[in-house]
């Protein structure tokens, strides 16, 4: 009976440590996610800038052609 209590106590202790480590890791992940929002904004800007540039490259000659009437 004593060895059973000892092993259960050991399992409880190890489980508590494991749970504590998981909480610390989860907290670190949440902090990292909060920092990622700035990186996501930069990535979104990088994705949209080429799109805007290509649309502008297509529209500017057409507008210039209509204004000057030299097509």
UniProtKB/Swiss-Prot annotation:
InterPro entries found in the cross-reference section: Antimicrobial_frog_1, Frog_antimicrobial_propeptide
Positions of the propeptide removed during maturation: 23-45
Pfam families: Antimicrobial_1, FSAP_sig_propep
GO biological process: defense response to fungus; defense response to Gram-negative bacterium; defense response to Gram-positive bacterium; killing of cells of another organism
Tissues of expression: Expressed by the skin glands.
GO cellular component, one term: extracellular region
Signal peptide: 1-22
Subcellular location: Secreted
Keyword Signal: yes
Origin superkingdom: Eukaryota
Disulphide connectivity of cysteines: 65-71
Tagged with keyword Nucleus: no
Predominant place of localization: secreted
Keyword list, A-Z: Amphibian defense peptide, Antibiotic, Antimicrobial, Cleavage on pair of basic residues, Cytolysis, Disulfide bond, Fungicide, Hemolysis, Secreted, Signal
Function: Has antimicrobial activity against Gram-positive bacteria and fungi but has weak or no activity against a range of Gram-negative bacteria except P.faecalis. Active against the Gram-positive bacteria E.faecium 091299 (MIC=37.5 uM), S.aureus ATCC 25923 (MIC=2.4 uM), S.carnosus KHS (MIC=19 uM), B.licheniformis X39 (MIC=2.4 uM) and R.rhodochrous X15 (MIC=1.2 uM) and a lower activity against E.faecalis 981 (MIC=75 uM). Active against the Gram-negative bacterium P.faecalis X29 (MIC=9.5 uM) is virtually inactive against E.coli ATCC 25922 (MIC=150 uM), and inactive against P.aeruginosa and S.typhi.
Protein family: Belongs to the frog skin active peptide (FSAP) family. Brevinin subfamily.
Protein name: Brevinin-1V
């Amino acid at each position: 009976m004593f060895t059973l209590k000892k092993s259960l106590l050991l399992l409880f202790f190890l489980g508590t440590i494991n749970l504590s480590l998981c909480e610390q890791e989860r907290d670190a992940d949440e902090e990292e996610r909060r920092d990622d929002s700035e990186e996501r904004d930069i990535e979104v800007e990088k994705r949209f800038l080429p799109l805007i540039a290509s649309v502008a490259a297509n529209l500017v000659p057409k507008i210039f052609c209509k204004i000057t009437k030299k097509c």
